[in-house]
Regions:
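Local sequence-structure signature of Cys/Sec-based thiol-disulfide redox active-site neighborhoods
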Residues: 1-25, 29
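Small/polar loops that bind or transfer phosphate-bearing groups
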Residues: 7, 33, 61
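Alpha-helix C-terminal capping segments
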Residues: 21-27, 52, 69-73
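Thiol-based oxidoreductase modules, predominantly thioredoxin-like and allied folds used
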Residues: 29-39
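Thiol/disulfide oxidoreductase modules built on the thioredoxin-like
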Residues: 43-48
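A short, hydrophobic beta-strand/beta-hairpin element that forms part of a small beta-sheet core
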Residues: 50-58
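Non-catalytic, surface beta->alpha helical segment in thiol-disulfide oxidoreductase systems
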Residues: 57-73
Length: 73
């Protein structure tokens, strides 16, 4: 299975639907990263979250559906 990472932060209104889409495809087999705990991540991702990486490559930004993620995987 591919390594899926979701970058998110508290108060992000687009993050919950993105996490739900990833969970629908991956179950609990993905990494959820709260960027608010790391200054560098905050700087890199704050204006782009949620960001979903698949095997280290940024594949989605802002929105995705479970079907779109399935197509990538």
């Amino acid at each position: 299975m591919a390594r899926v990472v979701v970058y998110t932060a508290p108060g992000c209104h687009l993050c919950a639907p993105a996490v739900e889409a990833v969970r629908a495809v991956c179950g609990d087999a993905f990494v959820l990263v709260d960027i608010s705990t790391d200054r560098e991540l905050e700087r890199a991702y704050r204006r782009r979250i949620p960001v979903v990486e698949v095997d280290g490559i940024e594949r989605f930004r802002y929105e995705l559906t479970a079907d779109e993620l399935r197509d990538i995987l």
